[in-house]
């Protein structure tokens, strides 16, 4: 039972009081503003960032000190200057600042756990989105079945609050949290769906949602590691975290005594689990009936413990060689490369067919063009168009914006097996930039290029990444040629591009 007590200590260590004084500090909201400003570096900075000012924050903190604004007028949204519909901006500010405050102790807990596991040196590389793909390249080629699962969202915010209660024993924190959510549900909008809240309070919602994912994964990993002692159909008795460990100790004794000969759930050493955002990939080498067990495990886990409805038909188990899945803006599938080898032994000749599996990762050109069309860089057919909303900026700013988007897309999609789709995206952005400059100067594209000679200038910028590679390696070297053909994964990408379309 010592290992179970160690696992329990992880939950107890998070039962601490939060740093409430930080909620009343101006620099916390400055951090929230800076986070959102740096987060949207790919397209345009959209949201309340442009409205941010310390004067508004000071006014907000003053109203937070005056508790009568939160309580006395709780039944009249027109009189309530803090929670009223017209002042929804205050709600956004406080949710961002509050999310930063509550993230602090959990980040410290994460750092301490990484130090204990002695992986703190590689933590920065593990944070990179691209670190997932080398793992898939190493593992998926040896597996046979894959299940592409979308993690369902809770339909009510109270479910997320209840999940948080298992980890944090702090009554004032939950009073404030429920007050905030209740006022949002009552006054700010008539739409009670969780999707509306996630759009208007993005960082706060991500904090609650990440807790939900962390809770279900902690149960999944714990049961996965101890699965040789458990029957899958009996897992539902563990879901009351307060009595989790006592029940498990009792069940191990019961299984050892009465059910040792009927254990139907055993370890699968070749099962792999990968998750990012709201999607997870489950892959296995063995027969699909084990995958079916895990499928029903997830369904019952979400339905019985988290009150989240999920249908079995939404989780499909497919042969890896016949199925492609979308992850982090890429289409991935395992391609079979067949070759025939002629072998001769004495006077007998044999033809041996060799099958080599290779993970094929490509850029989904149609969804990406759809995202570019939504951002007004091209039409739905992929034909570049000008962006008049940027015409008020200087030529240098316009070019810098387009080049920033192009570089980031090229940086993100350099792991593609086929680069032709990436070259087409670069062409769309390049021509859209030229059309925007021509629109600003009230000229045609041909006349603008002839007059300013911008074609060579843009060409130099759009090939900057290739120039860097050529600087590191000689132009006639085989290494440079392989880098142009092969995939390159960058371990400094911490979040996906805003134009990346991930279903």
Swiss-Prot record:
* CC annotations in GO: chloroplast
Protein function: Usually encoded in the trnK tRNA gene intron. Probably assists in splicing its own and other chloroplast group II introns.
- A Pfam family per the record: MatK_N
Q: Where in the cell is it found?
A: Plastid, Chloroplast
Q: Does the keyword RNA-binding apply?
A: yes
Which InterPro entries does this one have? Domain_X, Maturase_MatK, Maturase_MatK_N
Q: Which UniProt keywords apply?
A: Chloroplast, mRNA processing, Plastid, RNA-binding, tRNA processing
What organism is this sequence from? Vicia faba
Top-rank taxon, per record: Eukaryota
In alphabetical order, the GO MF annotations are: RNA binding
Instruction: Name the protein family.
Output: Belongs to the intron maturase 2 family. MatK subfamily.
Write out the GO biological process terms: mRNA processing; RNA splicing; tRNA processing
Protein name per UniProt: Maturase K
